[in-house]
Structure formats: structure tokens, C-alpha cells
A protein has these predicted regions:
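Peripheral, non-AAA+ core regions of ATP-driven protein-machinery
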Residues: 1-152, 156-159, 263
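Basic, amphipathic alpha-helical bundle interface domains used for macromolecular binding and assembly
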Residues: 3-12, 222, 245-410
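Hydrophobic anchor at the beta1->P-loop junction of P-loop NTPases
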Residues: 44, 153, 168, 237, ...
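Residues immediately C-terminal
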Residues: 47, 235-236, 242-243, 329
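P-loop NTPase nucleotide-binding/switch module
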Residues: 106-143, 147, 175-227
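Walker A/P-loop
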Residues: 152-195, 257
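Walker B catalytic acidic pair
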Residues: 232, 238-240, 250
Length: 410
């Protein structure tokens, strides 16, 4: 009899094949049962006895490390699981190799993984030098990168909003070791779990037709969605008002707390979702409101309806909102390249180093109490800010957003 306890916890995937087979071998006296207590096992078995890769290897390695056990799993998963420090990882090709290891006949070799020291294929990330003009938008992008701030760009079609957003990863520092482990633990839960390790920050750009489940994750067996896959990276939402309003509203919790709670009938899951939101939109349905040469064809009612798709509470959580105007013919024809991503990255890295030295986090993550303690402002600035808050009827959250951005600028 094979018993998978606890019975009330739903089981899925073939990762239990190897533990079940080893239990049978131990019960029949073919391996030493006492050896099993030292290890965690996971792997799908083929009819030939070969081990097939499973998803969730890095997440399982984290649990094994917490339990103080070594981890035996398919060879294809071993390098990924070995990213977790503090646990011995052994990769095996077959059930026979695992049995020989446990019996001391032919020990498995411990897998060591060298963490990537620099982003792989950095040259494939588009360079900011390709962007012509748009000096204000480039500055806003640099400020957002330096402080981890969310950013909304509004402007007519073809002004470079998407182009700028796609270049944000190129001016963000590479993942730290702890961040890399978190990012890859989430990726290991997906079916395409055999991707090559790299330290590039995630960049997710879901289509505006994406459902709530695709955005936050879910299903009968909860899996991370787009916002969790953008953890420690960038979530880019192009054509923001075209997203379903319910989809946009689910962003409010992770933008505030950095995690998402998923509840299903069978189980509940909590996934990290500390991402940097970058969004782009047109000023109106036709896209040409305020364009210097193309007239807008929209009625005032349609413009109001279009913009009302984005709720006030969501807009209140976006730190920076800028207009990206259309370029003149002279700006489009200029031959001189703009400042490169590498040059901007140096300034962003220096700014982040100061922030981590002061407070251990970027300014966008400062709590209200931390702002009150660390971001004191002069009396004259306090009076000017108070006047602006009253004149524009800004909320308390808006006040704190202004303080965070001001601290980054300083």
C-alpha cells in the first residue's frame, strides 16, 4: 500500500514517482531505510527507470534546506536547485543510480552551480541610445529606475512610449544573489522550467486581453501569474485602458504590499509580487488629443469614458505620470545618438547604492514611518508642499509618493 500523507492535501505532477519507488525498494529490503531520512527526493519515472525533470525544483530545494536535508532529483533539475545555498544537491539519471548512491555502491556527485555574475546576453537588451529626443521621458525613466518608482506614460501613437519601456531593463542593476533565488524559485514552478540561469531582471509585457487569472495566477493548482513572474523586475502594461478594469484592480494589492494572495477551493497560495509597474496609454480613444497637426476625432464623453477605465485608487499608486509628445521632423532626422544605457546605468547604480546604504531598500519601498523618520524637509518646502496639496486636493498617499520621488531626485 502506498500512502501519501496528509490525505487532505491534493497531489499533482509526477514528482512523487521517485519517492514512491524508493519506499517500495526500502520495504522490500533492497535499500537501507535509514538512509532515506537524510534526503528529500523528487522526480518523475519513465517505464525504463530513467528520471524525468519536474517543475518546482528550486522551491523544493528551499524547503529541503529549511528541513536540513540533502536533495536528490533528476539531473536536468540539479543545476537549478543548486542555486539554493545551504543544501547539498545530487542529480541522478535513473532510479538505479539513486539506489546505488543510497547503498554506498556508487555515490552521486554533488552538483555545484556558479551563480551568473553579470546579465547574460546584455547586448540583446535594446539600448537607450536608439531613442531620439524625448529628453523629459528619458529623465523620468532614469528617475523611475533609480528609485524603483512606478511610471505612466501618456501620448499619441508612435511617440516612443513602448520603445522607452522596453529599454528600462537595460538601465536596471542585475539581480542580487537573494533576488535571483526568489525569481528562479518562481520560474521553476512553471512548465518551461528548464531555462538557462541568468541575472537579468524580469521584464513581463502581457497583452491587454490577459485575464485576471493570467495576471495574478491561479487555476485548480495555483501557479504564479504575470505579476509574480515580474517579481524584482518590470511589469509593462501597454495600452493600459484596453485592459479589463477587473484585471487592473487586482494590481492594487501587490503594488501596496509586494505580494498576492490566491484562494481556490482546494488550496491557498501566497506569491511574492514586488514589481516595478510601467504603463503606457493614448490620451484618448483615437490617440491624437493635443497632437500639433492631427485633429482629435473623439467626443468629450468618449474621452471621459476612456480614461475612467483606470480607477482613481490605481492612479493614486503610480508615482510618476508624464506626457510623451510627438517628435518634430528635425528631432526624427537628427543623426547624433542619445546617451547610452550603459552611461545611465552607472548613475542608477550609484543612486541605488546610496539608498541601500541609508535604508537597505529603494525609495519606492519606504513605509510611511520610514519616510517620517528619514525624509525630513525644510520649513519653506513644507509650506509650499502643503499649499499644493490643498490646491490640488491630493490624498495622503499622493503626499507620500511625492516625498519618495523627491528623495530619489535628491
Amino acid at each position: 500500500t502506498v500512502n501519501l500523507a496528509p490525505a487532505d492535501l491534493p497531489k499533482e505532477s509526477g514528482r512523487f514517482d521517485l519517492p514512491i519507488a524508493l519506499g517500495i525498494l526500502a520495504a522490500s529490503g533492497q535499500i537501507n531505510p535509514e538512509k532515506l531520512a537524510q534526503y528529500e527526493f523528487a522526480g518523475e519515472l519513465a517505464l525504463s527507470g530513467l528520471l524525468r525533470p519536474v517543475r518546482g525544483a528550486l522551491a523544493m530545494a528551499w524547503q529541503g534546506m529549511q528541513a536540513g536535508r540533502s536533495f536528490v532529483l533528476p539531473q536536468e533539475n540539479a543545476e537549478q536547485a543548486a542555486v539554493m545555498r545551504g543544501i547539498a544537491v545530487y542529480g541522478a539519471r535513473s532510479l538505479g543510480e539513486v539506489a546505488a548512491h543510497l547503498n554506498g555502491i556508487e555515490p552521486l556527485t554533488q552538483t555545484e552551480c556558479k551563480l551568473p555574475q553579470r546579465p547574460s546576453e546584455q547586448s540583446k537588451i535594446p539600448d537607450l541610445a536608439d531613442v531620439k529626443g524625448q529628453h523629459t521621458a528619458r529623465l523620468a525613466l532614469e528617475i523611475a529606475a533609480a528609485g524603483g518608482h512606478s511610471l505612466l506614460m501618456m501620448g499619441p501613437p508612435g511617440t516612443g512610449k513602448s520603445m522607452l519601456s522596453q529599454r528600462l531593463p537595460g538601465i536596471l542593476p542585475p539581480l542580487t544573489e537573494d533576488e535571483l533565488v526568489e525569481v528562479w524559485a518562481l520560474r521553476s514552478l512553471l512548465p518551461n522550467h528548464q531555462q538557462q540561469l541568468d541575472s537579468n531582471r524580469p521584464f513581463r509585457s502581457p497583452h491587454h486581453s490577459a485575464s485576471s487569472a493570467a495576471m495574478v495566477g491561479g487555476g485548480s493548482d495555483p501557479r504564479p501569474g504575470e505579476i509574480s513572474l515580474a517579481h524584482h523586475g518590470v511589469l509593462f502594461l501597454d495600452e493600459l485602458p484596453e485592459f479589463d478594469r477587473k484585471v487592473l484592480e487586482v494590481l492594487r494589492e501587490p503594488l501596496e504590499n509586494g505580494e498576492i494572495h490566491i484562494s481556490r477551493a482546494a488550496r491557498q497560495a501566497v506569491y511574492p509580487a514586488k514589481f516595478q509597474l510601467v504603463a503606457a496609454m493614448n490620451p484618448c480613444p483615437c490617440g491624437y488629443l493635443g497632437h500639433p497637426s492631427k485633429p482629435c476625432r473623439c467626443t468629450p464623453e468618449s474621452i471621459v469614458r476612456y480614461r475612467s477605465k483606470i480607477s482613481g485608487p490605481l492612479l493614486d499608486r503610480i508615482d510618476l505620470t508624464i506626457e510623451v509628445p510627438s517628435l518634430s521632423a528635425a528631432e526624427l532626422m537628427q543623426q547624433e545618438a542619445g546617451e547610452s544605457s550603459a552611461a545611465v546605468l552607472e548613475r542608477v547604480t550609484a543612486a541605488r547604492k546610496i539608498q541601500y546604504g541609508r535604508q537597505g531598500k529603494v525609495n519606492a519601498e519606504l513605509s510611511v514611518s520610514e519616510l517620517d523618520g528619514k525624509a525630513r524637509i525644510q520649513k519653506e518646502a513644507q509650506e509650499a508642499l502643503g499649499t499644493m496639496l490643498e490646491k490640488l486636493s491630493l490624498s495622503a498617499r499622493s503626499f507620500h509618493r511625492i516625498m519618495r520621488v523627491a528623495r530619489t531626485l535628491a
